[in-house]
Amino acid sequence: MRQTILLLVAAAVLIGGLVCLRRASGQAGTMAPAAAGAGAGAVGAPHVTEMPKGFREWKMISIAHEEGNLHSIGVLLGNDAAYRAMRAGTLPYPDGSVLAALHYKDVLSDENNKVFGQEQSHVAGTPTNIQFMVKDSKKYAATGGWGFGHFSPDGKPGTDAQLATCFPCHQKATRDGVFSQYVP
């Protein structure tokens, strides 16, 4: 098994591509850069430059609350391909899968908390950003088969510096670069 993994890594380095060691290593869906130095991943790689049309009509997959610096509430939406794959637990995600993460400032609800008599209700405040992951294993081979997009609430694309943080973080996720799971 170890020799198989080493051969796959060596082949990936030689061809300058990306290899998903998911099946060979038993680590379902992990992504690995092909060559040393590819860890920056998103630098120089193509990005998602336009928000997909109709994404607000997609199906909800999950909701997340982020503490720390982000302190946000987010909802994860998926197109039909991503939604079906996530529900079925299909890894890796098929090409054509698109995920949209809509992030909002996490705020206390004064109105709700007056009813409850204590601070316990958090709601989505102002939108902070919209992020996309588009699966195209050929176009985005340098970043695990995923293209990343980051947009302001009014649709302006993110900076190269913002986009450069996407792949290094997502390659650590054990489900083909996706942190979230389907929530029925």
Regions found by a protein language model. Name each.
Residues 1-9:
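Bacterial N-terminal signal peptides that target proteins for export
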Residues 2, 22-23:
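Basic polycationic patches enriched in arginine
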Residues 5, 26-37, 45-70, 90-184:
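Sequence context surrounding c-type heme c attachment/ligation sites in exported
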Residues 9-10, 89:
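Exposed boundary/loop context
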Residues 11-22:
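Hydrophobic alpha-helical membrane-insertion segments, chiefly the h-region
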Residues 43, 81-88:
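Short acidic, Pro/Gly- and aromatic-enriched capping/linker segments at domain boundaries
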Residues 71-84:
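Short, structured beta-strand/loop micro-motifs enriched in basic residues and often containing a Trp
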